Amino acid sequence: MTAKIGIIGGSGLYKMEALTDVEEVRLTTPFGDPSDAFICGKIGGVPVVFLARHGRHHHLLPTEIPFRANIYGFKSLGVEYLLSASAVGSLQEAVKPLDIVVPDQFIDRTRNRISTFFGDGIVAHIGFADPVCPALAGVLADAIADLNLPDVTLHRQGTYVCMEGPAFSTLAESNLYRSWGGTVIGMTNLPEAKLAREAEIAYATLALVTDYDCWHPEHDSVTVEMIMGNLQRNVKNAQAIICETVKRVHAHPPVSKAHRALKNAILTPLDQVPAATKEKLHLLLAKYL
């Protein structure tokens, strides 16, 4: 089964309740095994592919997530649009726990993750000034707004700071990220978004705010208990938002520059790429060979 729309579920979102005609697909990729089986099915009759980012039993640390295998797996299943649901902490007073942010920017503070499919004889530099697809993010934000969910405040843009984890921020770090203009902080959307761009998949994030990190003087520092309590309240909303977004993307697929991200990004002449590397990356390079 193939699908043009993929969904990555973060902490708390380990399955899609609305999925029908469910089929589990286990893949092995040139970059190892993905986080779990891909769950193929339909939402409102629309084919989709779902993956639990940390595994369905949440057994993977953020650093341990096989980001390249996950994105490669989505690509091999035909995915062109990828919706990422992620738990985040807020770095701004105006962005409250239980709010929803659709980020338009990222700051990468990870340090132990491979962030590219390339190397081994091929060099590519993707454009990443706009790290999410504005068209897909717009569809997502419009779906949230039109659902008019109770007690949900939508923030149509913001900067997601991606830290390495698994420990939460120190107070000094949290205040530093605030001074940079960070809106929310999480541990998983990078290198995920970079790899999606290299795979020419349009990517957008549904960021579910669970806490105020540790900077807020009137709120307790973040704990797992706090996160999970608020996240469970957000998961029901996330399910509804994703279902509505899937319907809209299927009805009117947004035009995305991400779908041609490699067109002018590859510097190495393709006839000079080692055969083994070309074979490994054939899924990404096929239309340029």
UniProtKB/Swiss-Prot annotation:
Keyword field contains Oxidoreductase: no
GO cellular component terms listed in the entry, alphabetical order: cytosol
Keywords: Glycosyltransferase, Purine salvage, Transferase
Residues noted as binding phosphate in the record, renumbered to the chain: 11, 53-54, 86-87, 188
Pathway named in the protein's UniProt entry: Amino-acid biosynthesis; L-methionine biosynthesis via salvage pathway; S-methyl-5-thio-alpha-D-ribose 1-phosphate from S-methyl-5'-thioadenosine (phosphorylase route): step 1/1
Annotated binding of substrate, by residue: 187, 211-213
Enzymatic reactions: S-methyl-5'-thioadenosine + phosphate = 5-(methylsulfanyl)-alpha-D-ribose 1-phosphate + adenine
InterPro entries: MTAP (IPR010044), Nucleoside_phosphorylase_d (IPR000845), Nucleoside_phosphorylase_sf (IPR035994)
One GO BP: purine ribonucleoside salvage
Site (Important for substrate specificity) location in chain: 169, 224
CDD domains named in the record: MTAP_SsMTAPII_like_MTIP (cd09010)
UniProt GO molecular function: S-methyl-5-thioadenosine phosphorylase activity
EC class: transferase
NCBIfam families, A to Z: MTAP, PRK07432.1
Function summary: Catalyzes the reversible phosphorylation of S-methyl-5'-thioadenosine (MTA) to adenine and 5-methylthioribose-1-phosphate. Involved in the breakdown of MTA, a major by-product of polyamine biosynthesis. Responsible for the first step in the methionine salvage pathway after MTA has been generated from S-adenosylmethionine. Has broad substrate specificity with 6-aminopurine nucleosides as preferred substrates.
Similarity comment: Belongs to the PNP/MTAP phosphorylase family. MTAP subfamily.
Subunit structure: Homohexamer. Dimer of a homotrimer.
Cited PANTHER family: S-METHYL-5'-THIOADENOSINE PHOSPHORYLASE (PTHR42679:SF2)
Protein name: S-methyl-5'-thioadenosine phosphorylase
GN (gene name): mtnP
